């Protein structure tokens, strides 16, 4: 516990907030190249084969990013755009791949929440 004199001499230092997505380097999105596309199993109590990709970013980081939606066209050397946002049941996955940009196709036959999956409006 500091004395009042010590506090006058040097004020208390504020705690710096730690970023949840350091690989983005304060940018909303980052471009990267897929180095590996694979499936991963979630933590208990969930069970599935979640689609993820290892991505080397322009910021120099290599991160694991989640591929949302039903089906995807990604393979090694695909150029993708990633955003922040973790997947709660996949440890170490703190980024999402943005569908419908660069080499990532949008989700086919998607009718609801289309903007989140890069799907065009259905033909009427």
UniProtKB/Swiss-Prot annotation:
Keywords: Methylation, Ribonucleoprotein, Ribosomal protein, RNA-binding, rRNA-binding, tRNA-binding. Part of the 30S ribosomal subunit. Contacts proteins S8 and S17. May interact with IF1 in the 30S initiation complex. GO terms for molecular function: rRNA binding; structural constituent of ribosome; tRNA binding. HAMAP family: Ribosomal_uS12_B. SUPFAM superfamilies: Nucleic acid-binding proteins (SSF50249). GO terms for biological process: translation. Belongs to the universal ribosomal protein uS12 family. This is Small ribosomal subunit protein uS12. The keyword Ribonucleoprotein applies. GO terms for cellular component: small ribosomal subunit. With S4 and S5 plays an important role in translational accuracy. The modification 3-methylthioaspartic acid is found at residue 89. It comes from the Bacteria. Residues 104-124 are annotated as: Disordered. Disulfide bonds: none annotated. Coiled coil: none annotated. PANTHER family: 30S RIBOSOMAL PROTEIN S12 FAMILY MEMBER (PTHR11652). PROSITE patterns: RIBOSOMAL_S12.
